[in-house]
Structure formats: C-alpha cells, structure tokens
Amino acid sequence: MKKVLTNIKLRAAFILGCIILSLSIQAQNTVIKAGHLFDSRTGKFLDDQILIIKQGRILQTGSNLKYEKNDIVIDLANSWVLPGLMDCHVHITSNYPYRKISALSDIYTTESSGFRALRGAYNAELLLKSGFTTIKDIGNDANYATADVIKAIREGWIKGPTIFYSGKIIAPYGGQTGGINPENEGLWKFEYLDADTDDEIIKAIRKNIYFGANTIKIVQGDQQYFYTEQNIRTAANEAHRAGVKLTCHVFEGEAARNVILGGADAIEHGLFLEDSLLQMMKDRGMFLVGTDLAYNNIYAYGGDSAGAKQMSDRIIDRLKRAYKIGTKMAFGTDVIIDLPGKNRVESNLEILKNWKAAGIPSSYVLQTMTVYAAELLGIDKNRGVLEKNYVADIIALKNNPVENIDAIKKVHFVMKDGEVIKNE
C-alpha cells in the first residue's frame, strides 16, 4: 500500500512540476535589444531601443526597459531593426517564360492549379524569410491556387507571410487576353471572371469572396472597352459592404478617371497617369501602388532594349511626379517573370533601381513598405509600426537602409507574429 501511495505522490509531483514549468515558459517574454529601431511614422531610426514581446504582440518599447531574468533575449544591438516589410502587388503562383510573354495564355493549358499552388508556397516562404511579412497577391493564380497556399500557412504546414488575396481577376469580356481564336473562346476564364454589367460585377465579387478573397481586383482599360464610373462605384460599394478593399489595374486616361471618381481604394500601376489624375488621387486620399518595374524586369517580357528603356524612363517620370504631388503610395512589385539567376525576391527588388533613379528618399521608400502599406491594407492599427500592442512582425538588417535602400536585400533576422523565423 505504501508503495502505491509513493507512486501516486511521485506522479502527482511530476505532473505538478510539468504544470509549473509550462506556466514558467508561458510567462517568458521575448526581449529584443535593437541598436537602431525604425520609427516608420517619422522615417527615422532611434538608437539603443528595447522591445518586449508577449504572445505575439509588442508589450513595451523604449530605452532602459527592465525585464525578467528568465525572458528570452535577442541581441540585435549591431543591427537596424524595422517592422516587417509589405509588398502590395505580387503574383506568387506565376512565373511566365523569360522574354516569351506572348506565351502567357499557354500557361492556362500547361500548369495545373495544384502546380501553381506549390510554386506559391515556395515563393511565400521565400518572401517571408526575406523580410516580407505581409503581401497582397492579386490574381493570375489559376483556379484559386493562392487560397490553398493561405490554407497551408494557416494549418502550419508551411511558413509564410500574412496574405491579402483577390481571387480571380474581374474584367470586361476577355480579361487581359488578346488574339484568342473563337474556337478557344473563354480560355481566359482559367484566371479571370468576365463581368460586363453591374449585376455581373456584384456576382463576381461575391464569388471571389466565397472562395477566399479578402481584397478585390478589377482590370480596367486593357481592352478597347472599359468600365464606367458607375460600374466602378458598384464594385466599390459591394466590396466595402463585404469589408474588403477595391483596387483597380489601370494605366491612364478616362479609364483611370472612372476608377478615381468611382471610389476605388487604390490604383495598381498607373504608369502613365497625368498630373491632374495624381492630384485627384491625393485629394481623395487614394493610394497608388505603382509597380515601378525596372529596365531588367520590363526587358524580361520580350521586345527590344530601346522599348524597355523608354518604358522604364516613363515609369521613373511618373514616380517623380507622384512623389512631388504627394499622392499616397504603397510599395508593390508585380514581378511575374523571374530574372535569370535570380529568385522571386531578388527579381522583385530590381525595382528599387527606379525608386533611386527618381530620387525618392530611402526613408520614404521604407514607409511605403511599412506604415503606408498597412494603411492601404486596412491593418494600420495592428501592423506597420513597432509600438505597444502592435503585432510583432520584425526584421533586422546589417546595414542602414536609410543610407542605402539596397540594405533591405540582406535580411538576417525575421520575426512573424512573435515567432522567430530566421536569425543568422
């Protein structure tokens, strides 16, 4: 009997010890000692700061903060520490042939949604480990392949960023295709939803949301026909009723004016926007996600070198004008072709060449990747700055990105939702 009682006591002591240990571990906070901490609201670095993180959120920030002996301490005293970066225009499941963009529609018949999802999972993890903790994927992902990537991240099967996702791209008849013969009519529906009336636009938005979209994208102006101001207003109202943002692919002119007056939240590309339209966007607090592709990115589509150079120069000019006017901007890349010898992130960051060529201050570029991007995405109360109660999405660099924006190409530390993903 005594032996039985002894065993019971030992087991009880063991269980109690496990509970105490578990509570002790749960009580542990993570402390980051930051040599230089980026204040994304001001665009300046603060020296010798401490962040205390609890259960995925920032508990405190400041200098000379006290913390517990058993807290986990991460020493980034020799690093430049920033909020996790955001890219507001990606296509993680797409990779079209280098200099063969005419083969775009061939992808519809050669790559399954499953294959595209696998590519998306690979690129999602790559983006996260490169410091991009939030992305907006806006289509060209076959039959909702990105939705499966999001599910895989949610299930914990893979690591990836927070993903905003548009579903299939909504467009007037034909999507963004051209030259498809009548026998193959509708081939584009692999990636697009035809919507030519207000009722069809509403139905397309609802379909996308049903299948996992949490933002809506409309293509405007890629055909001779395009949406009216009223069509855009219908789309904006329906999206906003569902609690999501509306963004529109458009380049210039009347098509862009309809987007602005119709109440969309952002313009994607806007490569040739006139000053008057940029001013209208500023007056309405509307965002431009400029996708300011550099020469190498444009040349990858095909065509000659002179044409790529001319296009890049026009993009730089629009970037200069938008910055001077004060149009709100959020960072977005739009790469769908990996450059030779470069992965997706390296190909994406080629566009920094155009930001530098336009004379945009590095501090502002960083703000478009953090606090301004968060505002566009509607998450500025939770992400985009490193302050009390904000989600602990944090990265660190070896060099000062305000002095040279290329420093963001070498991220050595990544924390996502308080979890250390990378620490080199």
Tell what function each PLM region has.
Residues R119-T146, G160-K168, I209-Q224, K245, ...:
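Divalent metal-dependent hydrolysis catalytic cores, especially in the metallo-beta-lactamase
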Residues T93-F115, Y173-F190, D283-S312, G326, ...:
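Active-site gating loops and adjacent loop-to-helix segments of metal-dependent hydrolytic enzymes
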Residues W80-K151, E155-W157, Q230, V259-G262:
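Metal-associated gating/positioning segment near the N- to mid-region
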Residues Y173, I218-D317, V335-K342, G359, ...:
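Active-site core of metal-dependent hydrolases
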Residues M1-N29:
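Bacterial Sec-dependent N-terminal signal peptides
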Residues S105-D106, R314-N400:
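His/Asp/Glu-enriched, well-ordered alpha-helical/loop segment
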Residues G35, M369, E375, K388-E424:
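C-terminal cap of metal-dependent C-N hydrolases
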Residues L37, T42-L82:
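Histidine-rich, glycine-flanked metal-binding segment
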